[in-house]
Amino acid sequence: SLFHKAYNFILKSFFRKNLKHIYYGKEILKEINKINKKQDVIITIKGDFIDPKSILEFKKHTKKSIAFFNDNTYRCPKIKQVIDCFDEIYSFEKKDCEKFNLKFATNWIYNITVSSCNKNTAEYDVFNISSIDKRQPILIRIAEELKSKKINFNFIIYDKKHKSTNNNITYINTHMPLSEVNEHISNSKVLLDINRIGQVGLTFRVFESLGLEKKLITTNSDIKNYDFYN
């Protein structure tokens, strides 16, 4: 509603609070209270989307509160507001681990139901799906290069405002279901990964390529520092 939008604007502008984050925290606490039993461990992923007060309440219901962040403080500075709310914190971003004394943990592959099709029957040579941001010019240049070499590709960009246009890119303004993304991944020979500015942590796409035994093209040079790099 208009009232909630105005209220949320005031909270964020003057009190550095987000109404959605407060709501998420309250809803999680409701579920925790239903269990009515102290937990050995509570693991919170993307804790920057929950208000610090709720996270501190989580700690009353567990022996240990652990957080994992698959975004970095450069892109999501609110992570810094909740760092002190956990007993133990893991991050996929090495720079954040060094700067804030966090523990390092990579991302993972969670698409356990994805099947990898035969390379000879794959519809696309190269596939990428991403959100609209500063990576778009790089993606466009790669698309132009692949097209000039007659290499088949499927590049999809989620653009909520649907303002961008490029003949080599498919733009969508609603989130694509994970099952549909998995179909595109399965039906492609090579996955393309373009890391965000200020990010060196490896994305999920890297681990999907490992799990599905697909080739990977990435702009992230830090990949050479991992033990699986060849």
Regions found by a protein language model. Give the residues of each.
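Short alpha-helix at the nucleotide-sugar/activated-sugar donor binding site of glycosyltransferases
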Residues: 209-210
